């Protein structure tokens, strides 16, 4: 949003692929607990969007989707099931795109302290095995893939240091 302060940004009228997933999930969580007010939605969104559900600056946001999935699985919000699917294979993940391309990120640019914090987060994602379904296996039906209503699908990338380019 152009400011240096990290705050929960909510735009229901314009979303990207990840914020769409977060928005729908937050609305679903609020509804699950019988809450339909905007504050309950924002509370659920904050829980989903930030590491351990706590907003503590820019690097507390779950910028990498693999990190987002792991954190939200630990909170009991989602379940990573790719590895359970018969077509899944494993690859080694090494996340470092944000720290190695810090000039592309307003909050990281010219901020060595914040880059160091991001490097610490990325370090936890060095040589981590993750499951994915190769493109060559996607010529089967959604039933064969065992995709269920409400599943979140992420499109992986071969861009060095990055995990996902679309959800």
Regions found by a protein language model. Name each.
Residues 2, 142-145:
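Short amphipathic alpha-helical segments, especially helix-boundary/capping motifs
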Residues 3-131, 148, 154:
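Acidic/His-rich structured neighborhood in mature extracellular/periplasmic domains
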Residues 11, 15, 144, 158-162:
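Short, well-ordered coil↔helix boundary/capping segments
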Residues 131-143:
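Short alpha-helix capping/helix-loop boundary micro-motifs
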Residues 140, 148-167:
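C-terminal soluble interaction/assembly domains
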